């Protein structure tokens, strides 16, 4: 009976020891043949007995990755601690079981059949405990692997965070560098705009000056035309008055008085009787004057440029180089008549030689201007080839086209002047031929009229030797009209004279 009571007490203690770790693990383990029991239906969740501590805060919004990782790690650590406590309790229970088995061996040795049965039961319980221990160790290994994996994940996340921060810093630096570059470009653009504004203002001032100079040149050209027209009118009026006066004198005065006056007066020259000398004006032979290509005619500090300016004034018959009488545009005949109180006498009209000289001077100036234009054409072509930008190239091409148009106009002027020179030469040759024919006729008539008296012969010879008093003036007037017509044709509005 005592043995039976001892066995019952030992069995109850053994069942209590086995029940404690099973309760801590959250499952009911009974002393039966199967080690596991069905999960109780009154606990639908695994952690229904879990109570949250008030110190631990709860978050209504989803946690971030780092916080979720830390919370998972804490849960794993809690589980590991609980498993370790369970393992310790299991070891303690194993120790107690080993002690009890030693105590029970004495009793079991006495009872062999009961001992065999107890041995079988103990072996079964030991196998169950070893299996539980192996399962706990496997769980611990898995948890350790999970911890290592989580540590690696945390390291990888930190490395990614540092790389992202470095990329942000590099992007910020690049953005600052781009901002500085853009600022420099904007400053350069501001400087270029200021320079462009300066150039536009300078160009506007230069255009205004050019317009003023062109207006002055037009005024001077108009004044020169008016003076030429006035001079032509005065010359024609004086010539008509002289012819009327000579006709009246020849009709009123008898022949005897005229013969006596001729005998008493000394012999005078043909041109000195009725004409005054031409106004003293500085005439320049343009063929002897040099032309320096590429030099400006405006006044400058350079000696060569000043010489070029003086040559330009001399070629254009500037009033600066003339005396006061010429500048005041008063004819010499009027000054002489005012001083002496004599009757009005006109100046001689320009001869064919003076017209030829003026035409040669005009032709020389036109050729010089054409040479200057050709030199400018070469310079513009070089600049177009060396131009760095397209806008500058287009502007230079426009200037080149305008220069080509002016060169064509200048070439037309040169051809017109040359044609007029050729016409004058033809007229001169025709006049010489007519004069030769007239002299031959006079010689034939003198041979036939040898019976005439000496006085009548001398008068006839003089009359035949010199032309009629109206013919020479008519020829000179015709030459003057031709010269004025060619000047008007050359100074038309369709053409521009470049000085």
UniProtKB/Swiss-Prot annotation:
Transmembrane segments: none annotated. The keyword Coiled coil applies. Residues 58-239 are annotated as: centrosome localization domain (CLD). InterPro entries: Centrosomal_MT-associated, Cep57_CLD, Cep57_MT-bd_dom. Residues 277-490 are annotated as: Mediates interaction with microtubules. Residues 1-35 have a biased composition (Polar residues). This is Centrosomal protein of 57 kDa. It comes from Bos taurus (Bovine). The gene is CEP57.
